[in-house]
Amino acid sequence: MSKTKKILVVTCTKNDGKDTQLLKSMAPLSDDVKMVVNINNKCGLSKAYNKQLTPENLVYHDIVLFVHDDVYVDDLKLKGKLYTAINELEYDIVGLAGAGEIKITKPCLWHRMSRQESWSGAVSHQMELDGESKLNVTSFGPWPRRCLIMDGLFLAVDLKRVLEVGWKFNENYDFHHYDISSCLDANSKKLKMGTYPIYVTHDSPGLKDYNEPTYQQSEMRFYNEYKRG
């Protein structure tokens, strides 16, 4: 068996990135990954991510993992699992949480635009209970499972396949909706997407205010671009 290449792990951070959950979690995986950290990042995630979807990176990496800097990857089998998802399940894009269907309605959030029966995946979050820090696992549904849309906290791509079809992250969206718009674009290019059981803890409560102006502007753009009929 030929030796597998390192996973290229790409993230963006507003500071120097040294104290992020992601970098802390990558230390035990140094033999399996190479990090690209966009420090003091001011551009949209899509633009930053797309800079790594290049033929040059294909020389050293089969898989590129795009992950938020507040994600702690608590899985020493990360590399093997991603290769299994891509080589054996033939996924072109691998995520941790998503849905197998979508109906474009407002609010334009993946779990609000799909039936719970189509959900897949799981993500842990930190919580306080009785004055102590605990882990709360949000189980969306069975995995691995084919999906149409997935959450952008963790998306790994088969670099060769996405280059072949000319897929990139949708640069019309800086943060909100960049993930689900890019998934819909991937589906239109016949890329196969799905979840796989990789264990992480996400240090984020998610969207706090639907009425926040930046979110509302992004939602309107997404709704107008992808609404059918």
Q: Which positions does each model-derived feature cover?
A:
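Glycine-rich, basic loop-to-helix element that forms the pyrophosphate-binding segment
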Residues: 42-56
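C-terminal catalytic/acceptor-binding lobe
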Residues: 171-229
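Short, well-formed alpha-helical segments that are part of the catalytic scaffolds
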Residues: 11, 15-30
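Hydrophobic targeting segments
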Residues: 5-11, 34-37
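Acidic donor-binding/catalytic loop of UDP-sugar-dependent glycosyltransferases
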Residues: 71-85
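Short beta-strand-to-loop acidic/aromatic patch adjacent to the donor-nucleotide binding site
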Residues: 61-72
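Conserved catalytic core of nucleotide-sugar-dependent glycosyltransferases
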Residues: 82-165
